[in-house]
Amino acid sequence: MKIEMKNISKSFGTNKVLEAIDLPINSGEVHALMGENGAGKSTLMNILTGLFPASGGEIEIDKEDKTFKNPQEAEGFGISFIHQEMNTWPDLTVLENLFLGREIKNKFGVLDTKAMRKKATFAFEQLGVTIDLDKEIGNLSVGQQQMVEIAKSFLSDLKILIMDEPTAALTERETERLFSVIAGLKAQGVGIIYISHRMEEIFKITDCVTVMRDGLVIDTKKTKETNVDELVRKMVGRSITDYYPQKNAEIREIVFEAENLSTADFKNISFSVRSGEILGFAGLMGAGRTEVMRAIFGIDKLKSGTIKINGKSLTINNPAQAIKAGIGFLTEDRKDEGLVLDFSIKDNITLPSTKDFIHHGLFDDKTATTFVKQLSERLNVKATDEEQMVGSLSGGNQQKVVLAKWIGIAPKVLILDEPTRGVDVGAKREIYQLMNELAERGVPIIMISSDLPEILGVADRIAVMHEGKIAGFLNKKEATQENVMQLATGGK
């Protein structure tokens, strides 16, 4: 199958979001689609799959004009879109999810479970994975749920598969499994549109790359004929010569101390962070980094150990006590744990500091609005106003709202768990710059990141975890990818 999207444009009211877009999609090819959040990538794919119509232009499939009325019609034609937020029902089994709305019935109108099981088993065999058809989706890992979504595509003679940030929540092993599946699909002649911000993935698995910016296609070329610097320059419209901004903070006295922290997930964790310091936490998935931070913040209970701020021991049994002590925690899952998507920007930012705006028993909305406006401007949150629903913002702007929420409590220590996950190149740099500004004001920062170049580029010092223990610390001079990975895999 060959698809040609020609001169596609799209406007929502007076707001033009796509203009004169040309995009070729070929069978047996992995085509990367890159661009900052808001560039128009998802809008273009939603037009292709029939979620809404284009305002202009045409789509040709094998040289014939074709427009889909809805995503179901596109799926019937062999074109599937796996969104970043997966379309599964957690309380239903794998089999029920696969055939929801496309049930197979016998001549008497009764569900033909045997036929559905046979078809589902065949789909997973084609993917080279084994998944229990009777298990509830909610009990599967994110990687397994993703395989269910891909298997669902196989039920309709898959020809084109669109994947939006597919590795954002996967472990390293699940990511490699996905890459293996993509290679298999490519060998079968399936065309794949791969939307991602992760440069290393683009150069590892894609054949060509299209860069979008502000609703326009900037360039399309073979992946092997470009490089990271060129792609970044085309995505943001300027050269980012220094991807990680220079840090000028003075590192001073110890502010935060953790001594011999233990739970069932980690043992005897001890470290300290100084005023103005960014301490990175590296390690493989499952090493225990997030679990340590959740315990420090009072989400999970410590079995033993001591937490100190400015030399004073703290009792932290819940997040409220952690916030009162001056600890801010940006969690790795911003949508489920960091934000209330149905709340406004203002309501989200003021959540942990609501008491500061209550005077004589009443909430001072005017003061809160001014406070939120100032924070939003400082963090360059792109929104219509502070009353806009957070769920309607781009990933980068949502992350800035979470950061604003914790900056708003004037933290004595700030914990950031995967702060740039699912965030575009321009927003990443803004977050790095903000971290530097906080460090310059003396805030100690603890940053978990699975992106090795990021942690090497941002952290002053790195703690590397392996199987629930700190395997070692590396200073700026010692920190290389090789040294980090050696400690992360249990080497000395």
UniProtKB/Swiss-Prot annotation:
Binding site for ATP: 35-42
ABC transporter domain segment(s): 3-239, 249-492
SUPFAM superfamilies, per the entry: P-loop containing nucleoside triphosphate hydrolases (SSF52540)
Example GO molecular function: ABC-type D-ribose transporter activity
Pfam families given in the database record: ABC_tran (PF00005)
Subcellular location: Cell membrane
Enzyme Commission no: 7.5.2.7
Recorded superkingdom: Bacteria
Main location: membrane
Protein's membrane topology: Peripheral membrane protein
UniProt KW keywords: ATP-binding, Cell membrane, Membrane, Nucleotide-binding, Repeat, Sugar transport, Translocase, Transport
Reaction(s) catalysed (UniProt annotation): D-ribose(out) + ATP + H2O = D-ribose(in) + ADP + phosphate + H(+)
GO CC list: plasma membrane
Self-association and partners: The complex is composed of an ATP-binding protein (RbsA), two transmembrane proteins (RbsC) and a solute-binding protein (RbsB).
PANTHER family reported in the protein's UniProt record: CARBOHYDRATE TRANSPORT ATP-BINDING PROTEIN MG119-RELATED, D-ALLOSE IMPORT ATP-BINDING PROTEIN ALSA-RELATED
Protein's job: Part of the ABC transporter complex RbsABC involved in ribose import. Responsible for energy coupling to the transport system.
Family from the record: Belongs to the ABC transporter superfamily. Ribose importer (TC 3.A.1.2.1) family.
Name listed for the protein in its UniProt record: Ribose import ATP-binding protein RbsA
Gene name of the encoded protein: rbsA
